[in-house]
Structure formats: C-alpha cells, structure tokens
C-alpha cells in the first residue's frame, strides 16, 4: 500500500511503519518499532507505567470509515481505537493494533459515552408516567443500597465506566479526584483529553452501578433518599432540554477544580432581596467572566465560545462598478473588475481564511504555503473573472535544482476536503501571487502549495524550499492574577485575531471552547518538519509561567501536516496587589536546542477598577515609572518602509451641479463652480452641520485644494479622469501637506506624547531621518551616550520640541512636524492614537465650563455623575476654578471615548455631531475639528498609495 512508502521524519531513524504515525515519539520504549508496540488498553495503562502514556484515550467507532488518502486510518463500526492527539478538532490522531493515522472525530465516540443519558436531539423525552417503572427500565439505581452493605469494595483509577455524575446529569454530586504530580510534568500538551487521574469511587463487585462516596458519615438509606429528591429524573416534568440539564447539573455539582476561579460563581436570584440588586450582580459577574478567560470556568458555558469570531473573514457587497475586498489584517484580497455584474445588480462576496488545511495537501511531495481560502459568491450571472491576490509564506531555494524540482501552484476545489485541481492562470512577482478565477462557483476553496516534481523517497519538498511558519501568543482581553496564555503555530502567515482553545478540566462532557485574543506573532523559517520546543518567559519575577522555561513540544508530524498546534501556559501573579501589565518572551527551539525564533510581547492591562474615577489613560506618567517603559512587540519587529511621493490614482470623479460661494469663509469647506469636475477621495460620507442643518459631505480635491463638498451638489461619474479636469495633480506629498493643516491648532500634553513614542518607536535613526535630521549623529541630540533605544527616541523628540519653540525665521509646528514624520514611516496606528488624544484634550479646553452641556448631548450623563467627574479637582473649600474646568471635561471625554470603541473615526465623528447640537456651538468659531475629521478619513488612501509595493504593470494579469 502507498502508506508503507512513507519515510520517517524522526531524527532518531525510526523504522518505517504502515502510516504517518512513525513521527510519534515513544519515550521509554526499548525498540521503537511500531510492530512491537502494544495496544494501549485501559488495563495496560494500569499495569504499565501510566505517566508516559497517560493522555491516550480509548474510543469506539460508531460507523465505518474508508479513507481516500494514505494519512487517514481505516476502521469499521464497533472497532476500538486509541486517540493520541485530539487537538485538531475535526480530525484526531489515533492508532489501532497495527496502524496509525488521522480519523474523523464525528465517526467515533468516547468509550464512556454510555455514562451520559443525553440523546442526540438535546432532549430527554419519552419518560414513563410511573417514576418507579422508569427507574427500573433505565436501571439508574440498580442495587446500590446493597452495595453499601458489602464489605468487599474496590477502587478503580481509570475505568471509564466509573466516572459518575460529572457526565451524567441524573446523578448529583461533584467528582472527587486527586491529580498526580506527573500530570503537570507532561511536556506534550494534548488539549482535549484529561490525564487519567484516579477517581476515588466505591463500586459493587457484581454491578457497574456506582455511587460517589461523598457522605461517609451518612447512612445508605439517607443517601439514596437525598439523591432521589435532588435528582432531576424524579421531577414531574416529562422532558428536559440540554440547557436545563446544564443548569441542574451546575446547581448540584460543587467546584471541580481548585483554581483561582473556584469561587467565581454566577449569582443566584434567591441571594438578593430585589431584582435590581440581582441584575447589578449578574452584570458584574458577566463583565468579570468575559474579561478574564479562565478555561476551567468559562469552558462550562456552552454558549460563550460559540458567539465569538474565530477564523478571519469578511463579507462585502459590490455593485457593477467593481472594487476590492480585503481580508482584515492580511495580505489577501479579491479584485472585482468593473461591470463584473450587470448594471443594477450586486455581488456579495464572502472571504474566509480556514485554519487547518485538508490532509491530502501536505505530504512529502506537497505542502501548503497559504491558508485555505473559502470564497462564496451570491450572484452567478457574471461577465468577467475575479482576481485573487495573496502573499505566500515560502521562498524557493537559491540553487537551480530547487527551481526545477519545486513549483508554486494554485489549487482549487468545490469542497473543503477536495479533490483539488490546479489553476493555470497565475502570475507571481516575489512572494506575491495573483490568480485569475474563472468558471466561478457559489462556493470555492483556493490554496497555494509548493509541489515537487519528480521527488522520490527519501527526499521531500521541504529540502528545496524555505517555508515560513507563524507562532502567535494568545491570551485574555485583560490579565488577571491567574490566567492562561496559549502559544499557537500556524503553517502560514494568517494568524487570526482570535483563537478557540479547548481544555477539559474534570468534566467528562465536552465544554465549549474559549476565545482568546492575539497578543503578538512572528514568522520564522522552519528548515524541515521536526519537533520544536516552545518556551515562554516573563520579565518580572512577580509573574510565574508554569513549565515556561522547560517549554512544551509540538511534534514534527503536526507541522508537516500543517495542523494548528495550541499549547497552554498557566501564568500566576505571586502578589495580586502588584498586578500590572508585563512583557512575555516567546522562544522557539529546534530539536537540538538551537533558537529558531524569539520575540517579546507586551500583555494587556488588568481590568480597570469600577468607580467614579476615570477609566481612560492617565495624562501623566509617574517619575518612578519612566524606567519601566518597555518597547511594544510592534516597535521591536517593525521595519519602517519608505514614503513615496507618487500620484494618487484611486480617485473617483464627479460633476458639480451647483455654484457655491461662501460668505463666512471656512478653510475646510470648498467653493466651486457649476459644471466643473472634482476629484473625490472616496464615496464615504461625513456628517456635520452646514449653515442650518446637518448634511452629508464628500472629501473632494478641487483646483489644488482639499476640503468638503456637499454630497447633493456632486454627480459621481466614475474612476476615469476627464480630460478637462483642472488644477495640479494630487500626489501623496500634496495630500499629506493638505490634511495636516489642522494639526498646529491642536493642544497636546508633552509627557503623554513622549511616553507613547518611547513605547512604540523602535529606531531613533529612522525617526530622526523622517523629521529631517538625516545623517546627523546621536551626539547632536544628546550630550551623553544613551544605551537605551527608548531614551534615544526621547532625545530626538526633545530636540524637535526645542527647535519648534525657538524664535527662528521659520517657526515650525511641533504637532504637524511630529505627525508628518510618523506618517512617513508608516506609523498610522500611533498617529491615530495621538490625534484622538489631541482632539479630546483640545475639545476639553475649548468647551471648558460648558462641558456639562456637551456631556448631555453625547451620553446623557446624570447630575450625580457630573459631580463625580468634578469632585477630584475641587479644592478644600469644594470650589472648582474656572481655569481648571478642562480637567473634568477631559476625564469625561476619555471615559466616553473608551465606551464608543476602538474606531477613532467614530469617536471624532460623534464628538463633532455632539458639538454641533450644542446651543451656539463652538464649531462655528473653532473649525479645526472639521479639518481633523478630514485627516482621519484620508489616512487610508494616503497609506495605500504612498507605501504600495505594486508597480503599475503588476496590477494587470
């Protein structure tokens, strides 16, 4: 059979076996030949040493499975299999008496499945009217009262039939277990199955009916009565839904683990005197639970993980004018040409990056170099093909043999599991690929692979390529005194923003997975499929990472098959009173201990404490905290690109329908003449008040000036530039100069700006060059030699401030020069943070004593809440000076903006709308907030043009 020709990727030279399973490391076995490996039954685990193989789980097949490729395992209904790795989700790695391979998880069920009386429908119905008859029929109690009177009892440690009430909602009482120390020393993390810890239960020698010995001082009759009274089976209701059984079980069972979250329970209504008190307690519990993802606690909630986005995806609807759909946070996009569909019709495109590729795409002769993309179309009446553009995570070897032996191909299928067929019309430039997709289907699956030509065993495609894999660190949204981080390895560069993680505590029923957030990631070259060790270190002694220095292992066969591997690292704070964010160092080592990759990640902050105090960022950094500034992962790994002054070609054009000449001049509102042509940066509209009422506006470019034009006065004609378009051509340099006009009118706090730049700028040299200090040595900025890169960045910033405040002929604006420099090195994320802080502070200063009126327009704040914002700033006599009114206003705006969300555009837009609603709005005299709104809405087109790596001819296939 073809599977017998698979060579082993293990460096110890294991003999070939009958499937891919030779890559499993059997530690402690004298001869690692699979022909001599015993079947791992529960009895053998009792007799032999269970510490080395304690994660093996026995399952039984519920239907036949015939594989269609050599990496999967054939089995028949009723056959017993032994699962070695179940972290793959849909596919588990298992073996029978002779072979190893992947099996579909839906075709098998755990051997202790009969412990659960739940039906597939999620309901338990059809119960008899006579309760005693139902008990007799289901044999739930059996002869358990006699079992207490028997003197001969025995203890079972790993019999799956002796795991009581945790998996059976009809039996009440927690599972009392003791965990061996060996459980924490296991270096390989198999996430789904729990280590076979001994469970102390008392059972009859002649029957499989058992009762957990939780009441040693209670007589058997009292125990039986208590269980019968509390048992949900003996209620009058005929049927129970799965959610009701979960509630009944949660009420009857005690805590199953001794973690930090053991006391974090959902409040019960009977604990409170009023409905409002219960509602407040429930909301606080929900807020805490959602911010501190404890896997043991939240895993018991079947609805939590299912409501979170996991795989990166986007859905967009386009009309006949075409456009582009880009997958968020990736280099993957679909270009839709104009007239792709008929005029008046639309095309809805769904694009999703799948985490795990099909098994048939990864073997000795082929390996995936991009995620599998799922493309869904709503309209099949199309007139032209689509263009898929993506970046591959591989580079061919430099020698000529690599170019002849291996080729980069695009495969396509109508089903996720295949079969996949090659796509002929592809075009490559560097690591970017463009694929022409014709013969469109409603659902398509596309993937890029490196495929060998003429490769014979023992060679593999890995010897001719440099494949890159991505390691990402995931954790909760807010850190906690005790939480868990997860390291995940992906076979491509599309690490999702959120990741589902499974971990079973002592529960036998499968809990829902927990969603964690991406903290940081890095890509590195993996020379060959091999066992890699992932280590995690903390930079503060107050935080201890369990098994972080020893690391955890990802097996080579998982990397070869492109499977996503998830390793869990518990992290504990030694002193919860000193809880703060810290830095984690991720290290990846090869099989010989050499470092393949390492990078640092700054953790998020703890959950803010509730109270009247502002939850926004502090305006000033304490002096003792200046030495604790740590560069963010973005600043460490970022390579700053070069700003290119080139024409902006993505404009749309419109015909002006009306002549407008303004009596009260506004530098950000255009004046124009009927019949002329105007360029539009985009068709997105901005809402703000005109002379009398709110209107919608386009950002337009007219005769060398950028500003707003009323949307009703423009007829959009398309992307083709008319020949009679007047005025200078819009370039990125001119666009940058135009959008930065309002910056010099914004107020800032220098200490806050200095802190942000020290945390996010990784190279003082690049920063200085962008400011115009090219080729100047470090001594020009500081008198003494500075060792820290953050201090060097601060010295460059200090020099800029001195020159801007000096009385020179050409006085510079500190804010404008700083924002311009940051945009030239593509620090848009840092720019929008600074702009938002500047806008909020400037608004607070401009509004001052009228901030209460603004708060009513924005959030309808009560008088008590307003007093709470002003209380910290009053003097001993309870008075608040008029010159200090900006402080409570700033505190309120920080809190309000945090509630709006992370969209800086929404924050500034809603702030402008709220100011327009005030009596005698300050936007009548202070017009620069309108300019700031133009600035933040023009950043995307500026960045896409100034830092584009595409040549004009590269855009066409």
Swiss-Prot record:
Database matches in PANTHER family: SH3 DOMAIN-BINDING PROTEIN 4, SH3 DOMAIN-CONTAINING PROTEIN
Domain ZU5, residue spans: 312-449
GO CC annotations, alphabetized: clathrin-coated pit; clathrin-coated vesicle; cytoplasm; nucleus
InterPro entries, sorted: DEATH_SH3BP4 (IPR056183), SH3-like_dom_sf (IPR036028), SH3_domain (IPR001452), SH3BP4_C (IPR056181), UPA_SH3BP4 (IPR056182), ZU5_dom (IPR000906)
Domain of life of the native organism: Eukaryota
Domain description: The SH3 domain mediates localization to the clathrin-coated pits and vesicles.
Keyword list, A-Z: Coated pit, Cytoplasmic vesicle, Endocytosis, Membrane, Nucleus, Repeat, SH3 domain
Record-given protein name: SH3 domain-binding protein 4-A
Function: Possible role in regulating endocytosis of the transferrin receptor at the plasma membrane. Alternatively, may function as a negative regulator of the amino acid-induced TOR signaling by inhibiting the formation of active Rag GTPase complexes. Preferentially binds inactive Rag GTPase complexes and prevents their interaction with the mTORC1 complex inhibiting its relocalization to lysosomes and its activation. Thereby, may indirectly regulate cell growth, proliferation and autophagy.
GO MF entry, a single one: GDP-dissociation inhibitor activity
Signal peptide: none
GO aspect biological process, one term: protein localization to lysosome
Domain SH3 positions: 54-113, 649-719
